[in-house]
């Protein structure tokens, strides 16, 4: 993206006022803001790095934020946001869960709160298109998530989950998936989700294992055969699936 711009602090209070008007739960502190012209879009945007932003007492580690607005609004010292692009780094899932507790009840919310006990968004970028009332029209996101522990059931805990993701309104691409369950290691995997008339999901996982007597006893606690015999198996498996 080719840009030109100037640096100022004149819009700080205006931006903070607009943010708090939309949601008073935000606490925002800004350093100097750069007004830039995106030559590709012929559109102005306001840019700042490492702003101090808290929501419901949770610090959101935003590294950069860009707010696109109409040229005539800027000239009149007003802001009408139509696009927001921001990046985050090192955002712990505990902080994300605290924010999620404030949203409306849902099965997805309950699952995130009860089944994930660790993890981190290493880095992610979000591109949000909004209307003049700040209602979300379109979005894109990409990033890297790591060190997630996911509780599937009381006896099934998948650890050290990591993956890259790309998401928009029509697709979700998850790749470079790695994870471990006891002594079974998922070394690479991918999931593609396409939203058409119906959801279409395709995926594949490669798992590696080297199971000895102790590992079999952990995996098959109720099967006497593995307790009574010494067994060792090693190898790899490729799993592919498709859902429509």
Region roles according to the model:
Residues 43-52, 80-125, 138-149, 157-158, ...:
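Small-residue helix/turn framework positions
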Residues 132-137:
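Extracytoplasmic/ectodomain regions of membrane proteins and secreted proteins
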């Amino acid at each position: 993206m080719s840009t030109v711009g100037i640096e100022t602090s004149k819009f700080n209070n205006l931006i903070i006022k607009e943010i708090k008007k939309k949601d008073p739960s935000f606490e925002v502190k800004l350093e100097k803001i750069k007004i830039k012209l995106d030559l590709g879009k012929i559109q102005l945007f306001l840019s700042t790095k490492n702003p101090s932003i808290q929501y419901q007492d949770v610090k959101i580690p935003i590294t950069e934020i860009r707010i696109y607005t109409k040229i005539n609004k800027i000239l009149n010292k007003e802001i009408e946001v139509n696009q927001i692009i921001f990046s985050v780094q090192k955002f712990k899932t505990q902080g994300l869960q605290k924010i999620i507790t404030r949203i409306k009840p849902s099965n997805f919310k309950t699952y995130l709160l009860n089944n994930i006990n660790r993890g981190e968004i290493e880095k992610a970028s979000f591109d949000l298109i909004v209307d003049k009332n700040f209602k979300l029209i379109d979005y894109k996101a990409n990033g890297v998530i790591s060190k997630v522990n996911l509780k599937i059931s009381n006896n099934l805990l998948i650890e050290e989950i990591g993956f890259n993701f790309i998401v928009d309104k029509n697709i979700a691409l998850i790749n470079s998936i790695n994870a471990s369950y006891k002594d079974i290691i998922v070394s690479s995997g991918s999931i593609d989700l396409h939203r058409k008339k119906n959801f279409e999901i395709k995926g594949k996982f490669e798992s590696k294992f080297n199971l000895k007597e102790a590992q079999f006893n952990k995996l098959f606690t109720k099967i006497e055969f593995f307790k009574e015999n010494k067994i060792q198996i090693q190898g790899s498996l490729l799993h592919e699936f498709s859902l429509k």
